[in-house]
Amino acid sequence: MIQTKDIIELTDTYGANNYHPLPIVISKAEGVWVEDPEGNRYMDLLSAYSAVNQGHRHPKIINALIDQANRVTLTSRAFHSDQLGPWYEKVAKLTNKEMVLPMNTGAEAVETAIKTARRWAYDVKKVEANRAEIIVCEDNFHGRTMGAVSMSSNEEYKRGFGPMLPGIIVIPYGDLEALKAAITPNTAAFILEPIQGEAGINIPPAGFLKEALEVCKKENVLFVADEIQTGLGRTGKVFACDWDNVTPDMYILGKALGGGVFPISCAAANRDILGVFEPGSHGSTFGGNPLACAVSIAALEVLEEEKLTERSLQLGEKLVGQLKEIDNPMITEVRGKGLFIGIELNEPARPYCEQLKAAGLLCKETHENVIRIAPPLVISEEDLEWAFQKIKAVLS
C-alpha cells in the first residue's frame, strides 16, 4: 500500500507549489472522520472550507450521485436535462429569488456576479459605458480568478498578475460611513461576505448588513452577498445574512451546495437583475450538469431533513461558550456564529494546528493567527465534546 510520505513526495515532485497543506494524506472519510493510508483517524474540523457541511460521503448524497451517474452525467447547456429544472426550482425557493444561474466553483459564481452587476449597471442603471464600479471590503476573499483577485486587498494575492480589473473600490469591513462615501453614480454593486471567513471569522458590527442594504437601496446599488462559505447552515442560519434579517439583491452560493461530493455553484437573483443576460453572454459547459444538479438536490434535502442549520446554531453556541472559558492570555478572542468559529491568538496559529493534528484534530490556520473551527454540521454532541477537550489541552 502506498504510504503518506510517498504521496507527499509525488505531490511535491509534480504539483505546482500553490498550497501549503498540513503534512497529512486523507485516503478515506465518513461523516466527521477521515483516515490516512496508515489507518490513523482524525476528526475533520475544516469541512473543506465548509463544502462538507453534510458530512463526508453522506449516504443520501452518494446514492443520488450513483443513481444519476448510471443514467446521464453531462449534456452541456446545448440541451435540456431532466435534473436542471427541478434544481432551479429548489434553489429559487430556498433563496426566494426568481432566477438562478449555475456554475461549478465558487470563484466562477463570483465572476458571474461581477458580470451581472456590470451589465445591470449599463443596461438598467444607465451608467456610462466602461465606467461601472464595484465596492468591496478589506480582507475579503472571493476566490483566485482575476476578477476575484482584483477585488482583494491582499497584495500578495495580486503580485505578478497585473493589470487588475478596473473599477474596484475597497472600504474597511463593517464601516457604514465608508460605504456611503464610496458610492458614486457609477457604483454597480456592493459585494461582501456577511461574515469574512479567510479574514479569521470576522463578524461585522450588529446591524451593519441591514444598514448597508438600506444605503444600497437608496442609492440604486446592488447588494450582493457572497455566501459561498457562510451559506447553507454553516452559521446557524440558512444564510448568514439572516442574522440581520437581510435579503440581498443577489446570493452567491457554492461549496456545501454540492454536499462535499460534486462541485456546483450559482448566482441567484430576481429577473430584473439576472434577466440582463441573453444566450451567449455567459455560460459554462459543465454549469448545471445533471450529475451536479442531482447531487445538489440531495444535499439541500439533507440540510432540511436533518435540521443541520438548527444543529449548527445549538452546537455552535455551546462550543463558543466552552472555548471562551479556556484560560490562556495567548487567546485574544473567540468569535463565531454557529459552527463557524475563530480562535484568535497573539502569535502564529500554524504550530497549534500541527499540535491539534497530532492530537487527532484537523483544522487550518487562517489570517496567520486564527485557528478556524468548522466541523461538518452532522457532528454529534459527544464528538464535539471530545474535540473541545483536545483543543483545551493544546491551548491550555
UniProtKB/Swiss-Prot annotation:
User: What processes does the entry annotate via GO biological process terms?
Assistant: L-proline biosynthetic process
Give the protein's cofactors.
pyridoxal 5'-phosphate
* N6-(pyridoxal phosphate)lysine modifications at: K255
- What reaction gets catalysed by this protein? a 2-oxocarboxylate + L-ornithine = L-glutamate 5-semialdehyde + an L-alpha-amino acid
Q: Where in the cell is it found?
A: Cytoplasm
Keyword vocabulary terms for this entry: Amino-acid biosynthesis, Aminotransferase, Cytoplasm, Proline biosynthesis, Pyridoxal phosphate, Transferase
What CDD domains is this protein classified in? Answer: OAT_like
Task: Name the InterPro entries on file.
Answer: Aminotrans_3 (IPR005814), Aminotrans_3_PPA_site (IPR049704), Class-III_PLP-dep_AT (IPR050103), Orn_aminotrans (IPR010164), Ornith_aminotrans_bact (IPR034757), PyrdxlP-dep_Trfase (IPR015424), PyrdxlP-dep_Trfase_major (IPR015421), PyrdxlP-dep_Trfase_small (IPR015422)
Q: Provide the coiled-coil residue spans.
A: none
Enzyme class, one word? transferase
Per the record, the major location class is cytoplasm
Q: Which domain of life is it from?
A: Bacteria
**Which pathway does it operate in?**
Amino-acid biosynthesis; L-proline biosynthesis; L-glutamate 5-semialdehyde from L-ornithine: step 1/1
Example of a GO MF term? pyridoxal phosphate binding
PROSITE patterns reported for this sequence = AA_TRANSFER_CLASS_3
EC number assigned by the record: 2.6.1.13
A GO cellular-component term linked to this record: cytoplasm
List, alphabetically, the NCBIfam families matched: Orn_aminotrans (TIGR01885), PRK04073.1 (NF003145)
Q: Which family does it belong to?
A: Belongs to the class-III pyridoxal-phosphate-dependent aminotransferase family. OAT subfamily.
Q: What is the role of the protein in this entry? A: Catalyzes the interconversion of ornithine to glutamate semialdehyde.
Q: What is this protein called?
A: Ornithine aminotransferase
Q: Which organism is it from?
A: Bacillus anthracis
Q: Give the gene that encodes this protein.
A: rocD
